[in-house]
Swiss-Prot record:
Signal peptide start-end: none
Extracellular-facing ranges: 1-221
Low complexity composition-biased segments: 146-156
Cellular location(s): Cell membrane; Golgi apparatus
Pfam families: LysM (PF01476)
Residue span(s) of domain LysM: 68-112
CDD domains: LysM
Sequence ranges on the Cytoplasmic membrane side: 243-305
Stretches that traverse the bilayer: 222-242
Organism: Danio rerio (Zebrafish)
The name this protein goes by in its record: LysM and putative peptidoglycan-binding domain-containing protein 3
Annotated spans, Disordered: 31-60, 121-156
Length: 305
């Protein structure tokens, strides 16, 4: 038994020769064992629950995607097409087997992955039907209808959002007006002033008066400054010179008149001795001149005193 077990024990493979449809292994005990591909498929492992769910969701996603065939025109790029059809550049590359962006310029048409029930499939007459391939394709030609519809939908949505926002603001304003009943008059005045056109506001604004004493020049105009400079620089010196000349002439004439009126220095008169006539003497031949001489002496004496 022991020898038999040793003879029938596991032996390493000594040679492997490939064959068509199967492979053969030769062991040390010269026993041959063949395994076919069908036997190998019988041992396929089953996937777990999460992997099965992930595969089912991925298959559902692939079923939801439809490929639209679009002709490439001049000026088209991968980025512009991806923005137009709301898909990524990687999805477009994957659908068209593009390795680089330069391969895009060698194509005449492009497969674009879109959702099955999206606005892009609804706008076209050729609705995607179930085809033999797992994901259906439909050929389209680019028309401006899709862009216009997108613009109209986006503009309508933006208009609706703006209207909702304005309505909410109106409600808030109405609540504020109701809560502030005492100041309703002031609010009405504010609303009326806001509703008036801008031209009326410009007309109603009073003209701002400029301060006449504003600035470093104290509000003077340029002609006022020129007049002051002329008065200080020309008129004042001329008047001063004229006044000085007239004053000098008047002073000189005054001195000359005083000198002419004032008498010159007089020599002191020598008193002559009076000779009284003797009683017994004979009368002088000039006795008739004595009263005149006495009068002159009297005048000189008064002048000296």
């Amino acid at each position: 038994m022991t020898g038999r077990n040793q003879h029938n024990g596991f032996q390493f493979a000594t040679a492997v020769q490939p064959a068509t449809g199967a492979y053969m292994s030769a062991f040390g005990n010269n026993s041959e064992t063949e395994y076919s591909e069908e036997d190998g498929e019988a041992f396929e492992l089953r996937s777990r629950g999460r992997e099965r769910h992930h595969r089912s969701t991925s298959r559902d996603r692939k079923d939801d995607i439809v490929y639209l065939i679009r002709e490439i025109k001049e000026g088209d790029t991968l980025i512009s097409i991806s923005l137009q059809y709301f898909c990524t550049v990687a999805d477009i590359k994957r659908a068209n087997n593009l390795l680089t962006e330069q391969d895009f310029f060698a194509l005449r048409s492009l497969r674009i992955p879109v959702r099955k029930f999206s606005s892009f499939t609804e706008t076209h007459n050729t609705a995607p039907h179930k085809s033999s391939s797992p994901s259906g394709t439909c050929r389209i030609t680019e028309t401006p209808v899709s862009g216009a519809s997108l613009d109209s939908t986006s503009s309508s949505s933006s208009a609706d959002s703006v209207e909702c926002f304005l309505q909410e603001k109106d409600k808030d304003i109405q609540q504020l007006v109701k809560s502030s009943a005492p100041s309703r008059n002031s609010l009405s005045e504010v609303v009326s002033s806001l509703e008036q056109p801008l031209l009326g506001d410009a007309e109603r604004r009073p003209a701002i008066k400029k301060d006449p004493y504003y600035g470093a020049d104290w509000g003077m105009r340029w002609w006022t400054a020129v007049a002051i400079m002329l008065v200080v620089g020309i008129v004042t010196p001329v008047f001063y010179l004229l006044y000085y000349e007239v004053l000098m002439k008047a002073d000189v004439s005054h001195h000359t008149t005083i000198d002419s009126i004032r008498p010159g220095p007089t020599q002191p008169a020598i008193a002559e001795p009076l000779v009284l006539p003797q009683a017994n003497a004979a009368p002088h031949q000039d006795s008739h001149l004595l009263p005149v001489i006495e009068q002159q002496h009297h005048v000189k004496h008064q002048e000296e005193t």
